[in-house]
Amino acid sequence: MVRFTSFTSPFSAILLLSFGINKVATASTNTCVVAKSDSDDAITILEAFEKCKTGGTVVFPKDSTYNLNSIVTTSGLKNVNINLAGTINLPVREESYRNGDYYIQIKGTNIKMYGGGTINGNGQAWWDALDRTAPSVLRIAANDSSFGNFNIINSPRAHLNVTNSTNLLLHDFIIHTVSNNSNPAKNTDALDLYHSSGVIFRDSDLTIGDDCLAVKENVTKVTVSNITCRGGHGYSIGSLGMGGRRDFVTQVNVYNSTCIDCQNGVRVKTWAGGKGFVEDINFTDIYLEKAENPIIITTHYCDKNEMGYCNNNYETSLDIAGVHFKNIHGSGSDKGKPIINLNCSTESPCSDVTLTNINISKASNNTKNVCVNLKGSDKIPECSS
């Protein structure tokens, strides 16, 4: 049951996104406080969204806890505020959720989600079962919208999955997903981006088991800043081109961010045989601490969970051009990997790749830097060290 009230706000709340002047959320005319259900709080959550889907505010009150036993799918939201001040617990692992896309979907235009609350993914059972088929926690498909100032913990897979979105601000997240035993929290990306344009991700603290950022197929105009990531797989473009797919990523700027004890630091990864292009990528002012692979481009990425798409055709992949690494500093790990590993394809070599002011301390066993099929590598000092 939803407690439903009406009021007239004296003003409109307008958020000016730094990539434009788009309005995010407007004055609400209705407030829907999500009630508790006797069986499945997904039912009352959906009821609240239905009543307040146009010009309303959906409220999860502070100190309230909601337990889901089914998927929450919203669509057609317009001018909606979501005040998540309470806690949402996702379902425990069940066969019916395997290979699902998401647990919660928020879809619409001019949405603002905030509140300081928490979504708990209950991921431990998935990690203990070594099951990597869990859904993402939160899928966002939204235009001219803002999501932030709430927490996501114990995600069974990706925390934030953004698709088919434009002019989107993601900010002030605390994301914390760590296993309580020896079974690692694998495939728990903080943010996956697909088919989107004009996305800002900033001012967030991440402790995860996979990519801090994964900019995937058909994405353009992304800005990432002031992120601290711990224990993850770094800031990644890709993976792209799996199974010969045609993908593109352009105009991505990642700056003023940190990766501590990360497997990778800053990375571009594409599959052999993939088609499309990657261009205008900038990693600037990045601090890496004990990164196993601090700076890496690979055009023959292979995920051992997708071996059917792995092949030995290293001759072609996506065209990679205009990737710039600037002011990257910190330290490499003692795993014996090269500090810089730029390994491109024979028939589609990388071009216009620059390394400027790279200052990453080596361990005693770091191997020589790698620059393969990289146009202009003879003019890059790091390629000869």
Curated annotation (Swiss-Prot):
Keywords from the named record: Cell wall biogenesis/degradation, Disulfide bond, Glycoprotein, Glycosidase, Hydrolase, Repeat, Secreted, Signal
Modification after translation (UniProt) = N-glycosylated.
Main localization (coarse): secreted
Q: Which GO terms describe its molecular function?
A: galacturan 1,4-alpha-galacturonidase activity; polygalacturonase activity; rhamnogalacturonan alpha-L-rhamnopyranosyl-(1->4)-alpha-D-galactopyranosyluronide lyase activity
Report the active site residues. Answer: D210, H233
Name the Gene3D superfamilies for this protein.
Single-stranded right-handed beta-helix, Pectin lyase-like
* Comment on activity versus temperature: Optimum temperature is 30 degrees Celsius.
Provide GO CC annotations from the record. Answer: extracellular region
Location of the protein in the cell: Secreted
EC number, as in UniProt: 3.2.1.67
PANTHER family per record: PECTIN LYASE SUPERFAMILY PROTEIN-RELATED, PTHR31736
Protein name, entry field? Exopolygalacturonase rpg16
